[in-house]
C-alpha cells in the first residue's frame, strides 16, 4: 500500500494554478471575481499578523490553564506547526469554499492516478491519498509519477509518504484504523482520535453546544467499532 500526504497542503495551494483551473469551470465573470477575491485574501498583510496574535493568545491561555503537562506540550507542539501564508499561496482556513477548492485542486491528479496509472484501489480525502496494490514495485513507480504531478502543482509530498505492507494491524486513515480480519473489515478508532474528541468535549461548558457537538461526533463514530467509546463519552457527560 502507498500512502501519500502533501506538505502543508492548505497553506501551499498555488493561487495562479488554482485560478487557471477555475477559469475553465466558472463562466460567470462576477462569480469568478468573487472566488478570486476569496482566494487572494490570504495575500493581505493583516492575515499573518492576526494569525500571529491568535497563536500568541492561545499560548498564553495554555500556559495558564489547569491541563496537565503532557497536554500542554501537545497543544504547544500543534501551535508550533502552524505555518504563515506566503504571497500567492494558501486558502483561508475555516472558509467553506476552501474545503471545496482543496478537493478540486487535486482533481486532475485523481484522474491521472485512475486513468493513466490504472490504479483500481484508490482513495483520496483532501491531501490524504491511498493506493492499494499487491506489487510494491508497481507502487514505487506510481509514487515516482505522483511526485512529478504534485511538483507540477507546486506542491511536495511530506515525510509521512511511504509504501508499506498491510499487516493484520491494518492501516490508519482519517482518524480510523482499517483492519481486515477473517475476510471481514473492522473500522477502529485511533487512540489520538479518542483523546482529541474527549478534549474538545471537555472544553464545552454550554449544554446546548455540547449536545450539538456530541451529535456531530456520533455521526463520525457510527462507521467504527465504537460502542465502548460512545459509552465512555456518555459517562463523562453525566458527571
Ranges and model annotations:
Residues 50, 152-154, 237:
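Acidic/proline-rich low-complexity IDRs
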Amino acid at each position: 500500500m502507498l500512502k501519500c500526504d502533501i506538505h502543508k497542503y492548505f497553506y501551499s495551494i498555488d493561487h495562479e494554478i488554482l485560478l487557471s483551473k477555475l477559469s475553465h469551470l466558472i463562466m460567470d465573470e462576477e462569480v469568478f471575481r468573487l472566488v478570486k477575491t476569496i482566494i487572494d485574501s490570504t495575500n493581505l498583510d493583516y492575515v499573518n499578523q492576526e494569525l500571529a496574535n491568535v497563536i500568541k493568545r492561545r499560548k498564553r491561555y495554555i500556559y495558564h490553564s489547569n491541563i496537565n503537562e503532557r497536554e500542554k506540550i501537545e497543544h504547544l507542539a500543534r501551535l508550533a506547526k502552524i505555518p504563515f501564508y506566503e504571497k500567492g499561496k494558501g486558502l483561508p482556513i475555516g472558509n467553506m469554499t476552501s474545503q471545496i477548492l482543496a478537493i478540486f485542486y487535486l482533481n486532475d491528479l485523481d484522474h491521472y492516478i485512475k486513468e493513466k496509472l490504472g490504479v483500481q484501489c484508490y482513495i483520496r480525502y483532501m491531501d490524504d491519498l491511498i493506493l492499494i496494490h499487491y506489487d510494491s514495485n508497481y507502487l514505487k513507480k506510481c509514487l515516482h509519477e505522483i511526485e512529478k504531478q504534485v511538483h507540477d502543482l507546486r506542491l511536495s509530498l511530506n515525510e509521512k509518504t511511504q509504501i508499506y505492507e498491510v499487516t493484520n494491524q491494518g492501516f490508519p486513515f482519517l482518524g480510523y484504523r482499517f483492519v481486515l480480519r477473517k475476510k471481514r473489515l473492522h473500522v477502529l478508532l485511533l487512540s489520538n482520535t479518542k483523546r482529541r474528541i474527549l478534549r474538545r468535549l471537555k472544553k464545552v461548558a454550554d449544554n446546548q453546544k455540547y449536545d450539538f457537538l456530541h451529535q456531530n461526533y456520533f455521526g463520525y463514530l457510527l462507521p467504527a467499532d465504537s460502542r465502548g467509546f460512545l459509552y465512555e463519552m456518555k459517562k463523562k457527560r453525566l458527571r
